[in-house]
């Protein structure tokens, strides 16, 4: 009896290929698409600059902000472009808004621009998609960074940096310094929690801070009668724009004190053209010529939907394999930057139906949160310790015979050719381009002072006009596409090797340490964290999280001995002439065993996973005691991934 296959969970699928691979009459059509990409790119650059200038001026005048909706952004885009004399007249409210924006543009922004006319002929649909993107940019920036702004504001107002320096000067022993700095951090953490807490007026911080907290809440938390579910964090996700003016206020205060600021306004600083979205109507407007018939024959009376397959076949090789996948069919929409092309596919059973997309991502489960282990008890356990140098270090046991596998950052760099491409681009830039970019770096794009930001805009627009011809070369976009393909190739090669060593997805489950990097570390290349777990899930593996508390610093062989760095060597950085301890090599104080740090961590993760699956208590030397739980609880509930780690409740 054949088992009926179930369709995949994802409604949409994206396939990225070269535009040349799918476009017919490439020499004729590609220049038209490329020109549209460049026009859209210029419009976005100017729109984001103009919006920041207008919103700053509006805030300084009214101490509030207008609603940043699709109508407002679309009007901003169109007043920056050459006005069309044809078409139906706009609605009254749109005309009034456009007049207001035009007056501001002529007075404040036009003098900062070069003599260049923008136009959006046949680009109405493209502008609508870009409008949605800008709304998303603003709202995502607020949702992700508002809490960070509050924390930075508190640190600056209470001079955390200065106080820390003074403590380091005054206190003579390392123990005293660390203890005093820790107390200061705990005090400020309580202040931040009190500021962000709208449910409880009983402040947890010292009474010394209470009057300041009450005063500042008026400015850094929106003034509203009711927060959704009486919770600031939930309300932030529902109504992000309510928090933008608070972010502006905080960063203005930080800037007044001479500190570097974050930018509450999204900007496009990169000059290399980005992707635009093309749908069937845009194809008809942009590319359809008299050879294919009259445009009106396709645009009206429902003919656009009826003939969409025919229209796409005029210009694209839709018979190619990339347009049809198992379970999926072409959704008649692509994104392109003139060189690469991302084809959007829709699940066949959802074609013509209204699609409800679940915006809440699936929460990753900790292994000890599962209620039933019967399905996975017979499967092989692979423990993975994620890190910086070894992106993943895998083991399938806690003894000498355990199989090991690692995927390193050096290997990824080599296979993706990122270093090679970086050098190639640097050679291409030569001295003139670097000189221009160095000159621009002297101006502050993040400033919330209108005069300073105007100076930046003027210089940026001038340098852009000089550098457009250089950065619009196809080489930059080709290297970006090649980098994407190389990353896919490297990751698939790694997955294939993993399968050979540890078995396929039906035989194996994977337990990841819950390492989470909230911010990018200086001087380190970007790494895949959550993305690595997603990669294994997409390849069919069941993945679970493990609380990796003490997994690296406790010996997995003797069960609890402290592992410490012991080997000293010269610092590999040529500009530092000191000796340093080797980070990746540890020695156990108890049994004198020498460990690779990642191997020790992965082995401890394996022990925790094995115990959880077989209903055995977590090893005691890897448990949190009461003070550890309290320390974890004292951290901001808005920045921690979990309120309490699952293992802490089980082992306390």
Predicted segments with their positions:
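Positively charged, helix-rich recognition surfaces that bind polyanionic ligands
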Residues: 1-652
């Amino acid at each position: 009896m054949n088992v009926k296959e179930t369709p995949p969970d994802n409604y949409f699928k994206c396939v990225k290929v070269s535009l040349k691979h799918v476009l017919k009459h490439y020499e004729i059509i590609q220049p038209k698409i490329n020109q549209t990409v460049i026009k859209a790119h210029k419009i976005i650059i100017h729109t984001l600059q103009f919006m920041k200038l207008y919103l700053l001026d509006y805030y300084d005048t009214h101490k509030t902000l207008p609603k940043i909706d699709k109508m407002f952004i679309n009007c901003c885009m169109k007043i920056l472009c050459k006005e069309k004399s044809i078409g139906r007249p706009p609605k009254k409210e749109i005309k009034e808004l456009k007049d207001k924006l035009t007056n501001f543009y002529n007075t404040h922004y036009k003098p900062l621009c070069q003599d260049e006319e923008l136009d959006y002929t046949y680009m109405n649909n493209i502008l609508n998609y870009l409008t949605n993107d800008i709304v998303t940019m603003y709202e995502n920036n607020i949702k992700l960074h508002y809490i960070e702004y509050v924390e930075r504001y508190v640190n600056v107002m209470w001079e955390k940096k200065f106080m820390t320096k003074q403590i380091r000067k005054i206190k003579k022993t390392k123990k005293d310094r660390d203890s005093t700095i820790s107390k200061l951090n705990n005090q400020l953490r309580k202040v931040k929690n009190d500021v962000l807490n709208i449910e409880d007026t009983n402040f947890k911080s010292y009474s010394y801070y209470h009057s300041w907290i009450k005063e500042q809440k008026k400015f850094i938390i929106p003034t509203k009668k009711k927060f959704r579910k009486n919770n600031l964090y939930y309300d932030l996700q529902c109504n992000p724009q309510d928090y933008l003016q608070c972010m502006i206020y905080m960063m203005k205060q930080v800037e007044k004190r001479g500190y570097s600021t974050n930018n509450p306004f999204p900007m496009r600083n990169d000059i290399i053209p980005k992707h635009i979205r093309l749908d069937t109507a845009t194809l008809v407007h942009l590319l359809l010529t008299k050879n294919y018939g009259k445009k009106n024959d396709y645009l009206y009376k429902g003919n656009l939907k009826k003939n969409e397959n025919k229209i796409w076949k005029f210009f694209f090789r839709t018979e190619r394999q990339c347009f049809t996948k198992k379970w999926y069919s072409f959704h008649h929409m692509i994104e392109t930057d003139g060189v690469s092309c991302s084809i959007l596919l829709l699940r066949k059973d959802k074609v013509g139906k209204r699609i409800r997309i679940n915006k809440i991502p699936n929460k990753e489960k900790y292994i000890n949160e599962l209620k039933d282990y019967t399905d996975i008890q017979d499967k092989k356990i692979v423990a993975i310790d994620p890190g910086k140098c070894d992106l993943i270090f895998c083991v399938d046991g806690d003894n000498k015979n355990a199989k090991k596998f690692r995927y390193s950052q050096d290997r990824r760099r080599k296979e993706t050719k990122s270093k090679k491409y970086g050098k190639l681009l640097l050679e291409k830039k030569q001295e003139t381009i670097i000189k221009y970019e160095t000159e621009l770096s002297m101006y502050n794009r993040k400033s919330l002072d209108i005069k300073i930001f105007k100076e930046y805009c003027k210089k940026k627009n001038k340098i852009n006009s000089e550098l457009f011809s250089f950065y619009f070369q196809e080489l930059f976009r080709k290297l970006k596409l090649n980098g994407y393909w190389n990353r896919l190739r490297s990751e698939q090669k790694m997955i294939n090797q993993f399968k050979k060593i540890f078995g396929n997805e039906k035989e194996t489950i994977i337990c990841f340490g819950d390492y989470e990097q909230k911010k990018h570390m200086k001087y380190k290349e970007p790494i895949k964290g959550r993305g690595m777990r997603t990669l294994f899930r997409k390849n069919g593996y069941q993945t679970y999280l493990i609380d990796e508390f003490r997994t690296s610093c406790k010996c997995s062989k003797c069960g609890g001995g402290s592992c410490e760095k012991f080997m000293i060597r010269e610092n590999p950085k040529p500009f530092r002439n000191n000796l340093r301890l080797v980070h990746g090599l540890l020695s156990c104080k108890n049994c004198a065993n020498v460990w690779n740090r990642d191997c020790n961590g992965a082995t401890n993760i394996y022990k925790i996973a094995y115990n959880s699956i077989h209903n055995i208590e977590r090893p005691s030397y890897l448990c949190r005691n009461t003070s550890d739980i309290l320390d974890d609880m004292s951290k901001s509930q808005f920045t921690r991934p979990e309120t309490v780690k699952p293992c802490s409740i089980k082992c306390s």
